[in-house]
Amino acid sequence: MISENNLLPLNDTEHFLKNFLKKFPVYQTKIINPLANEQDYIYLLHLLEAEWHKQLPDQTFFLTGSSGHLSEDFFIPENQNVCILKNLRYMPLLMHSHQFIEINYVLKSNHSLLIDAEKSTPLQDGDIILCPPNLQHTFQTQNKNSIIVDFILRVTTFDTVFFHLLNNNNYLSTLFSNVIYGDSNGYIIWHCQNDSALKELVLKVYEEWENNLKYCDKMIELLVMEFILILMRSHEDEAVFSTSYINNSDENFRSLLNYMQMHYQTVTLSKLALAFNYSERQIIRIFKKNTGKGFSELLTEIRMNKAIQLLKNKDIPINGIASMLGYSSTYYFIKVEQSYV
C-alpha cells in the first residue's frame, strides 16, 4: 500500500503555483473572495492563466471551467459518484463554494489553515473536515510537506448511498444533517490524530483511485462508507461544529436531542419531560440556552431533515410521508414543509 511519503512530491500544477506565489508574493496572504470583490477575483484568474500559458503552454489551464461556485462535474468524472484528490498546495487563497459534499483528511498539516467567512482554523495531522455545499472557504497549504486528501461526493450519491448511515438517530447524525441539509453555513471538524485505521483507509482510498482498477468506483464508495462508519462509531464526541450552538452544548441537551431523534414521530414536550424527569420549563430553558430555539422548532427541523430524503422517493405518497414523520394531517405537513423550504 502507498504511504503518505508517496503523496509528498509536487505535481506540475503545484510547481507552477509555488513559482506563482514567489513571483506575486501578495497572494501568499491576500484572501480573494468573489462575493466581496469580484474584480479582484477576475484579475487573479486572468493573472494565473497568463502565467500558466507562459510556463506550461502545452497544458490546459488547470482552472478552465471553474468559478466561485464549483459544480460537481468540475471534479467528478461522468458516470462516477466520488472523486479522490490531493488538495493543491501553494494555491492562492481563493474563497469558493461548491455544489458537492467534500470530506478532507489532513495527512500532514505543517501549519495548514482552513479559512471560512468567519475565521482561520489551524489544522492538525489527522483532522477531518466535512465541508457542505455552499460553504465559502479555502485552504492555506503553502508548504511542500502539507498533505490533505479530499473526498468529493455528489449530493445525490450521499443521499442514496451514505445517508442511511445517518439514520441511527444519534448526536452525530444530527450534526451531519444540520451541516449538509440545513442552513447552518458551517462545517464539522474532528481531531483524530491517533486513529491509524482512518489514516490507512484514506491511503487505501487514494491508492484505489490512482490505480483505477476494475470496479474501483464501487470499491471507493464502500471504503468511504467504512470511513464514515468508523468516524461515527469512534469519534462522535470529538465532532466540533464550526458555527452552531451544538458546539457549546451540554450533555443534558445532547441526551434530549438524541431522544428526539429516536422518537421524532411521537415525541411531545410533555413526553420528553416525563422521560427525563424534568419539568417542561426546565427543558425549554435547556433548549433556549443551547440553541436559542424552542422544542417545536427543533422538532420541526428534525422532521424536515428526514422529509428532504423521503420526498426524493417517488414511490412514497405524500400522506405516507406525513404519517412516517408523525403528522396526522397531510395538509398540515405540506404547510409546514413549504414554510420550512
Q: PLM ranges: what are they?
A:
Residues 257-262, 266, 270-271, 278, ...:
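Terminal helix-turn-helix DNA-binding modules in bacterial transcription factors
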Residues 126, 282-287, 332-333, 337:
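Short hydrophobic/aromatic patch on the recognition helix
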Residues 2-22, 27, 42, 49, ...:
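A hydrophobic/aromatic-rich effector-binding and dimerization subdomain
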Residues 189-192, 210-220, 229-262, 271, ...:
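Short, Lys/Arg-enriched, Trp-marked, Pro/Gly-tolerant hinge/linker segments that flank
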Residues 101, 121, 214-222:
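Short, solvent-exposed positions on alpha-helices
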Residues 197-212, 252-263, 306, 310:
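Solvent-exposed, amphipathic alpha-helical segments
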Residues 77-173:
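N-terminal regulatory/effector-sensing and dimerization cores
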